[in-house]
Amino acid sequence: SWCYTAQNRFKTSKDILQDLVDIVSKNGCLLLNVGPKADGTICEEEVKLLTEIGEWMDVNGEAIYDTHPWRVQAEGNTEVVEGMFSEEGRKDFDSTDIRFTCKGDCIYVIPMKQEGEDIIVKSMGEDSKDFHAIITEFSVLGYEERPEYKREADKMIIHAPFVKSDKPVVYRIRMK
């Protein structure tokens, strides 16, 4: 709604962040509306959503702000239903659903969620036509612990069992 509606149904912060990552990976912009009440205040649910989104952006914003699409926009099994009022056909993302952005000497690999399992990145295998760089740093934003990675002919395997999130997770690959 473009204004306050008492019976409004809200997306979760997870859904909004997944939409944001998907849109930015396609070089798009997300328009997020907050409908104020007549007195100018916003309801508690909207404050909660904005706070959760802001906390995620504080950690992962470098993969969003001033980035552009990488050679590969997306990998994964989940079909994204696009267009206005498409929420009814929305399917949950899983850890095979990965988006990519890049900036400067970094590529950001962004699984839409991660539950402790290995992440398989098909477009970053040793034989990939899309990724030829030398990796100088491999990290996961928001964690001090470093993930492990291994490149095989047809894929990169990211091993980070300490990462568990139903929201997008950002791996930063610095390269030369």
Residue ranges and their predicted role:
Residues S1-K176:
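Mature catalytic domains of secreted/periplasmic carbohydrate-active enzymes
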